[in-house]
Amino acid sequence: MKQLFATTARGFEELLKVELTDLGAMDCQITQGGVHFHADEETQYRVLLWTRLASRILLPIVTCKVYSDLDLYSAVVGQNWLDYFDEKAHFMVDFNGTNREIRHTQFGAMRVKDGIVDYFERVGKPRPNVDKSQPDIRIHAYLNREELVISLDLSGDALHMRGYREDTGKAPLRETLAAAIVLRSGWQLGTPLMDPMCGSGTLLIEAAQMQANIAPQLHRLHWGFDFWKGHNQQAWDKVKGEAIELAEQTFNQNQKANFYGCDLDHRVLQKAKRNAQNAGVAHLIQWQQGDVAALKNPFVEAKGTVICNPPYGERLGTTPALIALYSVFGQRLKQQFADWNVSIFSGEPALLDCLRLRSHRQFKAKNGPLDCVQKNYHISARATASDENTQNSPEIDRTLTSSQVAVDFANRLQKNSKKIEKWAKQQGINAYRLYDADLPEYNLAVDRYDDHIVVQEYAAPKNIDENKARQRLLDAVTATLQVTGVETNKLILKVRQKQKGTNQYEKLANKGDYFYVNEYGAKLWVNLTDYLDTGLFLDHRLTRKMLGEMAKGKDVLNLFAYTGSATVHMALGGAKSTTTVDMSNTYLNWAEQNLLLNDLEGKQHKLIQADCLQWLARCDRQFDLIFVDPPTFSNSKRMEDSWDVQRDHIKLMTQLKRILRPNGTIVFSNNKRGFKMDVEGLAALGLSAVEISAKTLPLDFERNKQIHNCWVVRLKADL
């Protein structure tokens, strides 16, 4: 009996132990990342040939303590390597783990290699060659703190490399992981198994090989034991011969084609067919090109299992298309697969919530570096009937009848859309708000920018369960897609939290996707993906229009200008000159592009990058019209002092008065809820203010009276 160690992905140790026991292994002991076991020669070969879950099968040679690189070298050079292989065999070393002295795995591998070749020289043999591409012998070294285990890798290439997969799609599963998913799915041998997003077919092929009694390594040509002196060819031939005989017997039983794979991509489906042919299970699997939205049950008379590894994104904010995909998938499952079991493997648990199914079992697993989850469900006949009843519900519009998701939200969004879109067309605008937290349960905003939709989630209150808030967001995205009919790649999802300083201007992506929208004759660039904001504050639309109407023949200043959209309106309104000041180079360049887009060029349009307050203190020219829309609060590193609009607005007005011409006007706005203008402070400066907030709220923002406040400030002497 030999002591061996089977490695596997973390989370699969218990499954592997069961498999090894079934294959005849003895004394199986689970440890992190694998299972220790004992086996005689035939069982050893049977495990190598039949394991579907192990990554490698290792034969430990040396176990020792390593406190220095000398300890490592001494342990290796003192081993009798001729007991394992001769000098003609090419070898390589895999080294995993570090400690305080052995800090790099490459260094560890080099010292093991040195010890082996030096041993051969010491006993008067030629140095064996190192071959990292196709070695005859693979030495595996694992260092955990001070404990070193050196093993002979009997597998050779990793055991997930079955040999049948010649090509894959964009996101392939390792075969060992696929086998584990199948085993955890609850699927029973002999019953139908369907994968509606099968990709290169790995899940179905692994399951089909189980049903066909095909050993996963049956066609492997090279093994790690081929040049091992302890290899027993007779025992190996016996075990392999038994496996071949079992596969042939099963093949002759005329098994039904109980496996069914679908995918939207016909090219990857062709690869799946070739993979199945290579794996010897092509006769068991039917393939069909198709969309999940039209998914049908091909096994109407039977009960089986749907298994799937659908696509998933690393970041929720980049996956509105996936939200729609999972939502539609869940609907089709309930409509088509009554009394079936379903098992879904995903790297984004939130997306699984879009299925709107209740799992009865779930497992955690790793797919490479990604933390993933596998959830098992049962589609009851009652759930199927409920979904059918929802389709016939008279309470919601026919555009929504494909889903029971967020009905209240969907109805409100649809009602708002009918009203606002008609008004927007009359106004000559194509960027506007459709929904703004109208319902407390759906705390988000929905904005249209031409043929794009932006869904912005507001930060949920602390007393709201995070999972519930996320589920509502996902439901709202699904409903938004259905109501608006927007293409999934033109829906942008953003998570908005309370702002701190100027972090609203932090970059989120670098796609550079700009397009322009129309606003009362002005064309304005927007970017929906790269920043938390889009480059256009929609609630200030009427303010910009008013500024344009006030600007004719005047020298105008836009302070805290952002992307200069107000400057564009004032310039188009006939301003004599414009001065645009902002601290951000990015947004100042954006402002310049906005001017150019509207054919506004010339020396009369000045763009100044500066700390606005410092620039204002130095400014020595005067203006007829000043628009100032400062942040509520800022503590930017590029500013000398912090800024608070409530605390500091009189200081700001003091400086603005200095550069305001007689009969001039200041339009002052901010977004601080509950802002109180210091009327007495203004009076002491010789200024008076009239609030015009209600007049600057457009129809699409009338439900949010406090989104901004706006004031017209003039010199008292001019009144």
Curated annotation (Swiss-Prot):
EC category: transferase
Keyword flag Glycoprotein: no
Kindly state which reaction or reactions the protein catalyses: guanosine(2445) in 23S rRNA + S-adenosyl-L-methionine = N(2)-methylguanosine(2445) in 23S rRNA + S-adenosyl-L-homocysteine + H(+); guanosine(2069) in 23S rRNA + S-adenosyl-L-methionine = N(2)-methylguanosine(2069) in 23S rRNA + S-adenosyl-L-homocysteine + H(+)
Q: Is Repeat a UniProt keyword of this protein? A: no
PROSITE patterns assigned: THUMP, UPF0020
Q: Which UniProt keywords are present, listed alphabetically?
A: Cytoplasm, Methyltransferase, RNA-binding, rRNA processing, S-adenosyl-L-methionine, Transferase
Residue span, THUMP domain: 43-154
Functional note: Specifically methylates the guanine in position 2445 (m2G2445) and the guanine in position 2069 (m7G2069) of 23S rRNA.
Family, according to the entry, reads as follows: Belongs to the methyltransferase superfamily. RlmKL family.
What's the name of the protein? Ribosomal RNA large subunit methyltransferase K/L
The protein's organism comes out as: Pasteurella multocida (strain Pm70)
